[in-house]
């Protein structure tokens, strides 16, 4: 029977990413986000909330995992993508995927939103 094996939340000020964009700090965005994520966000009229909510999802994942960016995890090992119905999913790769599996987690659930000045994400892990 599945059980709750991890939980993480994160809240991000959208203005933080608006400042990165206004200052042309593309190196930060390239370090934090995959090419697919950057393309998706930059295609939006206001990309800042979309970057912020993706960053919140990655931070929430790291909190649920309990590792932060240790053990070789990179920001680009985590990517927020849309499933065919439009729901955001967090896709793992590299060390993030390996640690997730090695620690006995079998399913990852993501809920995220942005409104006003903030972006928020919650990540829940299930184990067997």
Curated annotation (Swiss-Prot):
Entry's Gene Ontology cellular component terms? cytoplasm
Q: Where in the cell is it found?
A: Cytoplasm
| Catalytically driven reaction(s) | apo-[ACP] + CoA = holo-[ACP] + adenosine 3',5'-bisphosphate + H(+)
Major enzyme class: transferase
- Signal sequence span per UniProt? none
Cite the GO molecular-function annotations of the record: holo-[acyl-carrier-protein] synthase activity; magnesium ion binding
What's its EC?
Answer: 2.7.8.7
Task: Identify the InterPro entries for this entry.
Answer: 4-PPantetheinyl_Trfase_dom (IPR008278), 4-PPantetheinyl_Trfase_dom_sf (IPR037143), ACPS (IPR002582), Ppantetheine-prot_Trfase_dom (IPR004568)
Entry keyword annotation includes Magnesium:
yes
Q: Which residues bind Mg(2+)?
A: 10, 59
The entry's keywords: Cytoplasm, Fatty acid biosynthesis, Fatty acid metabolism, Lipid biosynthesis, Lipid metabolism, Magnesium, Metal-binding, Transferase
Q: Which cofactor does it need?
A: Mg(2+)
Give the primary localization class.
Answer: cytoplasm
Superkingdom per UniProt: Bacteria
| GO aspect biological process, one term | fatty acid biosynthetic process
SS bond list = none
Function recorded in the entry: Transfers the 4'-phosphopantetheine moiety from coenzyme A to a Ser of acyl-carrier-protein.
Q: Per the similarity annotation, which family is this? A: Belongs to the P-Pant transferase superfamily. AcpS family.
Protein name (Swiss-Prot/TrEMBL): Holo-[acyl-carrier-protein] synthase
Give the organism, scientific name.
Syntrophotalea carbinolica (strain DSM 2380 / NBRC 103641 / GraBd1) (Pelobacter carbinolicus)
Instruction: Give the gene that encodes this protein.
Output: acpS
